[in-house]
Amino acid sequence: MATSLDDLVNMTGVILAFEFTPDGNCTSYKNVTREMAAMICRFCAAVTMNFNALASGFTELSEQHWVPQKGWIYVGGSHTVILRRGGYRGVFAESSRVSIDEVSAALAD
């Protein structure tokens, strides 16, 4: 059974959750304003797009499998960003409280 955005924001340390399309259109969000969700989705879409380009290039040059992308994680300052489902579903979390492994697994559902 897929984990809902409500379930995600109820996980320890998770502040907000969101989903978006490859072009950065925010399709759903929890615990954040519409305006902030739109900005988050646009920025995360850009990062996902960059990782997709890097992975394609690495695959071609190294003849190793780097695609398809499953997701990415950023940790900086006191916050963590975790994206899964190809980099189109994610959460922002408090780094000191979140279990990256647990949230990553829940996002992959």
What are these regions, as identified by a protein language model?
Residues M1-D109:
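Non-catalytic interaction/Regulatory regions outside core domains
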